Amino acid sequence: MEKFLDINEIKKIIPHRYPFLLVDKITELEEGKSAVGYKNVTANEYFFNGHFPEEPVMPGVLIIEALAQVGAVAILSKEEFKGKIAYFGGINKAKFRKKVVPGDVLRLSIELTKIKGVAGVGKAVATVDGKVVAEAELLFVIGK
């Protein structure tokens, strides 16, 4: 089932808030299986003040965090996990391929490949204009 979630609906699922909410909308959601979200990267992002003032680049760790937030929406939409928190449990095989700069629109996709008990694994890919900018395997742990 595909669903569209705006920022207010995302905030009902995950606890992140400005300045650390890094997903603007979810355009595809298959509950407990996959999700696609978007982040409009603007020149006004707080992290560009220091990374780097003369050549602003979105930190790779924040791209991974944005992917993890989309993953949290996917896993927490599963009926048994609704109302809980998804913690970032780990990261494997992270690769950063291209810079993300002001004006870019990040497409953030995750496919949950394994859920066992309160833990899950997802394959995450971030793209800009159809080109991969980052990818990783993310691990999630569900808390109360």
Curated annotation (Swiss-Prot):
The active site is at 51. The keyword Lipid biosynthesis applies. The keyword Lipid metabolism applies. GO terms for molecular function: (3R)-hydroxyacyl-[acyl-carrier-protein] dehydratase activity. It catalyses: a (3R)-hydroxyacyl-[ACP] = a (2E)-enoyl-[ACP] + H2O. It comes from the Bacteria. Keywords: Cytoplasm, Lipid A biosynthesis, Lipid biosynthesis, Lipid metabolism, Lyase. It holds the Pfam family FabA. SUPFAM superfamilies: Thioesterase/thiol ester dehydrase-isomerase (SSF54637). GO terms for biological process: fatty acid biosynthetic process; lipid A biosynthetic process. Its EC number is 4.2.1.59. One of its GO terms (cellular component) is membrane. It is found in: Cytoplasm. Disulfide bonds: none annotated. Involved in unsaturated fatty acids biosynthesis. Catalyzes the dehydration of short chain beta-hydroxyacyl-ACPs and long chain saturated and unsaturated beta-hydroxyacyl-ACPs. Belongs to the thioester dehydratase family. FabZ subfamily. This is 3-hydroxyacyl-[acyl-carrier-protein] dehydratase FabZ. It comes from Clostridium botulinum (strain Loch Maree / Type A3).
